[in-house]
Swiss-Prot record:
EC number(s) given by UniProt: 1.8.4.11
Name used for this protein in its record: Peptide methionine sulfoxide reductase MsrA
Keywords, ordered alphabetically: Oxidoreductase
One Pfam family it belongs to: PMSR
Physiological role: Has an important function as a repair enzyme for proteins that have been inactivated by oxidation. Catalyzes the reversible oxidation-reduction of methionine sulfoxide in proteins to methionine.
Amino acid sequence: MSFFDSYRKKMQMPSKEEVLPGRVQPIPTAAAHFVSGHPLKGPWPDGMKQVLFGMGCFWGAERLFWQVPGVYVTAVGYAGGITPNPTYEETCTGLTGHAEVVLVVYDPKVVTLNELLALFWEEHDPTQGMRQGNDIGTTYRSVIYTFNAVDRAVAEKSRDAYSQALASRGLGPVTTQIADAPDFYYAEDYHQQYLAKNPDGYCGLRGTDVSCPIPLAH
């Protein structure tokens, strides 16, 4: 396979016939958040809400959100594909269909979904399709997965507002997928809160320098 054929393949979602089979049992992961000590898989306090963000390599994206006041816990994992309970190595092949994502569990009385969305839009480039900077492939696509119809509508409205802001600067279009939350598979222990364990580790987050115009209260 030539370089160009290989590149083109990495930019395409796999077919059902191509995806890896995965496994029935979840892969082992951490029980608690390395920074906060809160349970990674719950139970969480009453009133917490959830959202999944994919914005390239999940190491830097997770650190972005665990630092936000009102975010109770974060975890990295895989979502949006077909392969059940994938490993990191399998996901990197592009043959699971999954994106690297961050689960954000937050208290809406302290931080709003719009505030989290503003961070999402401003801290990566949502116009790059199946890549994020030097990280190339469907694994690194931009996604927002919400857990109810109201939150999905809020996310879509924020996308429309940010699309206009980008267009005014000659940028776009936005390629971010917004959809109902699919199954979320926790990543391996060593990926959880990676940049807290490895402060000098890789972080590929790069924004567009365009501010998000959405109202932060919702």
